[in-house]
Amino acid sequence: MYQSPRGTEDILPEDQPYWHFVRQQAARIAALYGYQRTDTPVFEDAGLFVRSVGEGTDIVSKEMYTFEDRGGDKLTLRPEGTAPICRAYLEHGMQTRTKPVKLYYLSSIFRYDRPQAGRYRQHHQFGFEAIGEADASLDAEVIEMAWRFYNLLGINDLSLELNSIGCRECRPAYISALKAYYGQHEGKLCSDCKTRLDKNTLRLLDCKREECQCVAENAPRSADYLCPDCLAHYNRLKECLTVVDLPFHENFRLVRGLDYYSRTVFEIQPRIEGAQSTIGGGGRYDGLIEQLGGEPTPAIGFATGIERIILNLKRQGITPPPLPSPSVFLAYMGEAASLASIALASDLRKAGIGIYQTYAQKSIKAQLRQANSLGADWAVILGEEELKQGCAVLRNMKEAGQATIPLDQLICEIKKQI
């Protein structure tokens, strides 16, 4: 028997209320902050991610699903959402729009990663990107928007981790300091970090291996290497977060796993026991648009995994509102009533009344049991005698009361009751 591929999952009917709830609140918060939805293809030119994410990153070197199509083009299933949005921004001339251009997405993401709780090889992200503004007040707004999104979902006990990793002017000196420091402790590093020492130095700070975390504790701090402009930007960001009452913790070891980040980086973590350590994060990527062939353009974004959000909602006992479902069951008895019930079902649905119905001849008792199991509040019963009299029985399934209603008044009566 076939099963879903490793690292993927089916989203079954019982989980759909969570997904609908999260997507609904994502669209709501996006509208509040002036973001417009943009959907990009599920696969892109592989070079887009090699160039933007970085050849030395784990994503490019280990995790991308890349294939060659029949035309010989090398394509990659989307491993992250920012680069495709930036590609679309350039391709469709959005740089002529009023800045900042605010775009959001709800997309499937694909990474060949080790499956674990809240982490899948196919997962889904809500992300938003603000392109064309460098002021730190926009950084604060993006962080606030992410924070308020979780609040809308009922996730309130959160921690905001904040750092600045500088720009292309000051970061090289910081990376040199990291290389010198880690070079003195190379023998204590895991094999991955020994590779990162030359290829992706900042990621040394992010390793979760205990031996590497011990080395990272005394590593140079990015804050000590910021140029005057980056330091002023970082201080301005902290001031803006303070005036909107967003508490933050400065984490000078915080980096992000993609090469395009600059200046602001941040992560949001739930504080509850057993929760995923990070449910969302983002940062500024002022060089990415230029790197993809555009003019120098500042930008900042955020992304959060929907599977991780739902995992945390369940752990906190947060139940989403149920999805709408029919509250009326249509039962019938007899061949003539069978055809009449098909026509009646069509009329009820045209009138906006959702119904369940039976499709094969069963006893009325069996049909009403089915109505109960489906949770219907009302049953419309149509038999041969009712049909001759031009009426139907409307039964209250919760209170066991019923009334005979003329068919030409049935729709109005049901609408009154539901």
Swiss-Prot record:
Subunit: Homodimer.
GO molecular function: ATP binding; histidine-tRNA ligase activity
Primary localization: cytoplasm
Catalysed reaction equations from the record: tRNA(His) + L-histidine + ATP = L-histidyl-tRNA(His) + AMP + diphosphate + H(+)
GO cellular component, one term: cytoplasm
Key word Iron-sulfur present: no
Protein name: Histidine--tRNA ligase
InterPro entries: aa-tRNA-synth_II, aa-tRNA-synth_II/BPL/LPL, Anticodon-bd, Anticodon-bd_dom_sf, His-tRNA-ligase, HisRS-like_core, HisRS/HisZ
EC number: 6.1.1.21
Localization: Cytoplasm
Record GO biological process: histidyl-tRNA aminoacylation
Organism superkingdom: Bacteria
CDD domains: HisRS-like_core (cd00773)
Keyword terms, alphabetized: Aminoacyl-tRNA synthetase, ATP-binding, Cytoplasm, Ligase, Nucleotide-binding, Protein biosynthesis
Family per similarity comment: Belongs to the class-II aminoacyl-tRNA synthetase family.
